[in-house]
């Protein structure tokens, strides 16, 4: 697990739970300080986590260590090698999100939801990726 050497303390996560397929936005700091992760996992299993960073931003070592702690504590699968973490400003594929759901992986990181495509290949953006997740879950 190699965190990017940049500074951004506003890392957000989307937590999808098997129980209600609900999407919740938190920061790693919020989860750590307010113990919200324990509350979320008390009644439903966390399946995977999506990090959202803005264009040109990246996770901090603090956020990375926090995520690693959550993965270890709740025995979630590590990031699958054939998914790989996206670099800041790139776009995650819906197939990667589906793979993560199936294998209960964490650590799929996507770019700014306000940008429709990467401008080059027209790959789907963050919002569309999440739409695929909702569709995949029968919603």
UniProtKB/Swiss-Prot annotation:
One of its GO terms (cellular component) is extracellular region. Keywords: Hydrolase, Lipid degradation, Lipid metabolism, Secreted, Toxin. The keyword Lipid metabolism applies. One of its GO terms (molecular function) is toxin activity. The keyword Nuclease does not apply. Its EC number is 3.1.1.4. Its main location: secreted. It catalyses: a 1,2-diacyl-sn-glycero-3-phosphocholine + H2O = a 1-acyl-sn-glycero-3-phosphocholine + a fatty acid + H(+). Expressed by the venom gland. It is found in: Secreted. One of its GO terms (biological process) is lipid catabolic process. Has a highly toxic phospholipase A2 activity. This is Orientotoxin-2. It comes from Vespa orientalis (Oriental hornet). The lineage of its organism: Eukaryota, Metazoa, Ecdysozoa, Arthropoda, Hexapoda.
């Amino acid at each position: 697990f190699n965190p990017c050497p940049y500074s951004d303390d506003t890392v957000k996560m989307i937590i999808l739970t098997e129980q209600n397929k609900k999407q919740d936005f938190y920061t790693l700091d919020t989860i750590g300080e307010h113990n919200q992760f324990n509350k979320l996992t008390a009644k439903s299993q966390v399946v995977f986590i999506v990090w959202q960073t803005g264009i040109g931003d990246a996770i901090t070592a603090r956020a990375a260590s926090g995520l690693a702690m959550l993965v270890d504590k709740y025995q979630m699968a590590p990031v699958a090698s054939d998914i790989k973490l996206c670099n800041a400003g790139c776009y995650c594929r819906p197939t990667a999100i589906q793979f993560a759901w199936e294998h209960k992986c964490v650590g799929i990181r996507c770019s700014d939801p306000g940008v429709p495509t990467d401008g080059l290949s027209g790959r789907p953006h963050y919002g569309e990726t999440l739409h695929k997740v909702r569709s995949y879950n029968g919603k």
